[in-house]
Amino acid sequence: KNFRWNASFNISRNINQIERLSEGKAYLEGDLWWMQEGGRIGDFYGYKYINVFQYDESNAFAEGSWQQLTPVFENGVFQNKYLLNGTEYTGKVLQKTLPNGKPFRGGDINWEEPEGSRDGIIDDNDRMIIGNALPDVTGGLSTQFTYKDWSLFISFYYSLGGEIYNFGEHNRNMFKYTGTTPSPDVIYNTWLKQGDIALY
C-alpha cells in the first residue's frame, strides 16, 4: 500500500502528403525544402553525392549508361585506357561538366544525375529529393514510482526516421571562416592530391 508504480506509453505515426498548392506549381522554400503536390512536407532538396573523383581521369563515364569508368595507370602514368566492370572499355568516354563546360577534376565531387536528366551537365536540373526531416514515428514513455511521501518521475521521448540537416557542421566544414577548425572526419578524409581516396 505504501508503494505505487504508474507507467504510460504512447506512439504516433506521421503520414503527410501535400494535396494542393496555389496554382498547382511546385516551388523551393528557402533553397532547401521542396514543395510539390503529392510530395511530403519536410522533403530535403539538393544534389546527391556519389563520391570524390580520385584522379582528373576519373571523370569518365560510359556512353549511354553513364556508368563511371576506372582509369588505368602504370607506375603513376595514365595509359589512356579505361575499364568498365573490370573489362577494357573501347566506347566513347563522356565527362561531367559545370554549366560553363568546365569538366570536373580530381578532388571534385561526383554528383548523381536523376534519370531523364543525364546530360553530363551538373546544374539545377540535377537537384532531387534527398531525404525528409520529419520522423516516421514519435512517442514517449513515462513512469512514476511512489513510496509514502516520496516519488520519482522519469520520462523518455523518442523518434524514429527522419534525416537531420546539421547547418552548424555544414558551416564549420566549408572552410569559409579562418578561425574555424573543420571536424576531424573532414580533416583526415579530404582530397589533397591525385590518387587520394577521399570522402570530401
Residue map of PLM features:
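Residues that define the transmembrane beta-barrel architecture of outer-membrane proteins
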Residues: 3, 135-139
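Transmembrane beta-strands of outer-membrane beta-barrel proteins
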Residues: 5-7, 141, 147, 152-154
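Transmembrane beta-strands of outer-membrane beta-barrel pores
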Residues: 11-17, 147-149, 158-162
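Conserved small-residue
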Residues: 2-129, 173, 184, 188-200
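Short, hydrophobic/aromatic alpha-helical segments in well-folded domains
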Residues: 123-126, 138-141, 146, 159
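C-terminal beta-barrel architecture of Gram-negative outer-membrane proteins
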Residues: 152-200
